[in-house]
Design a protein with these regions (language model features):
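Non-heme Fe(II) oxygenase catalytic core, chiefly the N-lobe of the double-stranded beta-helix
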Residues: 1-131, 137-177
């Protein structure tokens, strides 16, 4: 899947940081890479980690509540080392979705420490009108922590480009376990 973020209004109150897992994986120490090879991580969506639903638009709140209640959509397993549709290898990493790796209690933190080194991270300082396109599979992003009252004024539009479930690439991902 891909995502586009477009800065609409008051976007300069917080930067977004993008971690590129492609060079992080290429330069990863052998010991850490060996711990990732063939492993899958379990992710469980937790809306409480994402946003304060009391401040959301009513339709957003309903969507978040449905995601929270729908056990099939709430949890998933994904390979740590992934290839995107273009065949580029990287790491799928998503700590905010209660990420765990069975049998390796410290791997999530070790991956975070490795992937979010300054040399793998780009900081985008937003200006209204900016558009960022990203690969959601092997690129991770996080927002700078700033005062809530500043974020309440910021408007970014998010567009998601979904992969068709009939696609051969999707079948390969599902059959890889």
């Amino acid at each position: 899947d891909g995502v586009a973020l477009q800065a609409i209004k008051n976007s300069n109150v917080a930067s977004t940081f993008y971690a590129n897992s492609v060079p992080a994986l290429k330069e990863m120490p052998e010991e850490l890479r060996a711990r990732c090879e063939g492993k899958k991580a379990h992710f469980e969506y937790d809306h409480k980690k994402w946003a304060d639903v009391s401040k959301m638009h009513p339709m957003q709140r309903i969507t978040m509540q449905f995601l929270s209640l729908n056990k099939e959509r709430r949890a998933m397993d994904m390979k740590l080392i992934q290839k995107n549709r273009k065949g580029i290898e990287g790491i799928y990493f998503h700590r905010l979705n209660n990420m765990t790796v069975e049998g390796d209690e410290t791997l999530v933190q070790d991956l975070y420490d490795w992937m979010f080194q300054d040399k793998y991270v780009y900081e985008h300082k937003w200006e209204d009108g900016d558009i960022i396109l990203m690969d959601q599979l092997i690129t991770q992003h996080k927002r700078e922590f700033v005062a809530e009252e500043l974020l309440e004024r910021r408007v970014l539009h998010r567009f998601t480009f979904m992969v068709n479930n009939d696609d051969e690439w999707v079948r390969e991902q599902q059959n890889s376990f």
